[in-house]
């Protein structure tokens, strides 16, 4: 039998897509903050044309994670993971942490000019 979906994959996909969406702007700033320098840092904007695709993927993945976590729970058999209230509360907490990180990553390119 297959394991029931719990939203973990959608949370991971949303977080990864948000990181990729802000990689063109966040990457050079992180490298400069770590002490790296050079003209090659300007080439890290290669992902900029794909930013809208990554933003869309992040939002779609978060929607599916939200739907999987907050929709009415299916009947769980005793002893299954979905029957444990602490697990559901943990998934909700992780969802909101990832959602906040996605919003920070998506908004970072707009506040980045204030750091340079």
UniProtKB/Swiss-Prot annotation:
Family: Belongs to the MerT family.
Matching InterPro entries: Transprt_MerT
Residues that coordinate or bind Hg(2+): 24-25, 76, 82
NCBIfam families per UniProt: PRK13751.2
Protein name from the UniProt record: Mercuric transport protein MerT
Job description of the protein: Involved in mercury resistance. Probably transfers a mercuric ion from the periplasmic Hg(2+)-binding protein MerP to the cytoplasmic mercuric reductase MerA.
Subcellular location per the Swiss-Prot or TrEMBL entry: Cell inner membrane
Membrane-spanning parts: 16-36, 46-66, 94-114
Higher taxonomy: Bacteria, Pseudomonadati, Pseudomonadota, Betaproteobacteria, Burkholderiales
Keyword ATP-binding carried by entry: no
Molecular function (Gene Ontology), one example: metal ion binding
Bilayer topology: Multi-pass membrane protein
Keywords assigned by UniProt, alphabetized: Cell inner membrane, Cell membrane, Membrane, Mercuric resistance, Mercury, Metal-binding, Plasmid, Transmembrane, Transmembrane helix, Transport
Originating organism: Alcaligenes sp
GO CC term, one of those recorded: plasma membrane
């Amino acid at each position: 039998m297959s394991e029931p979906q719990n939203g973990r994959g959608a949370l991971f996909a949303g977080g990864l897509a948000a990181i990729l969406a802000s990689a063109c702007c966040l990457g050079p700033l992180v490298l400069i903050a770590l002490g790296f320098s050079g003209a090659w840092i300007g080439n890290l904007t290669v992902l900029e044309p794909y930013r809208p695709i990554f933003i869309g993927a992040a939002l779609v993945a978060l929607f599916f994670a939200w739907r999987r976590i907050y929709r009415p729970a299916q009947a769980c058999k005793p002893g299954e993971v979905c029957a444990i209230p602490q697990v559901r509360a943990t998934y909700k907490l992780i969802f909101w942490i990832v959602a906040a990180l996605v919003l920070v990553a998506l908004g970072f390119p707009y506040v980045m000019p204030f750091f340079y």
